[in-house]
Amino acid sequence: MAKTLNSICFTTLLLVLLFISAEIPTAEANCDTYLGEVTVYYPCRERDCEAQCYEHYPHSCKGECEHHDHVVHHDNEEEHCHCYGR
């Protein structure tokens, strides 16, 4: 009886651990939808970028300072703040 109970508890614990570990990477990986671009002062800082993203796009989950391909878009070296959401 005790071995059966221990086996059931171990199996249940293993399943719970599996469900939790499978959910964590998917929650972090879903922040990849481009929402738009916001203006920040040069030089672009991640903290300022994330604050501006949250202000303009309340459902944003991250903001990143990124370089554009300046041959096509601009003549000067410039970083832009891109906002991403789920």
Curated annotation (Swiss-Prot):
Keyword Aminoacyl-tRNA synthetase: no
Keywords tagged on the record: Antimicrobial, Disulfide bond, Fungicide, Plant defense, Secreted, Signal
Subcellular location: Secreted
Domain of life: Eukaryota
Major place of residence: secreted
Bridged cysteine pairs (disulfide): 44-65, 49-81, 53-83
Gene Ontology CC: one annotated term: secretory vesicle
Residues making up the signal peptide according to the UniProt record: 1-29
GO BP: any one term: defense response to fungus
Family: Belongs to the DEFL family.
Name of the protein in its database record: Defensin-like protein 205
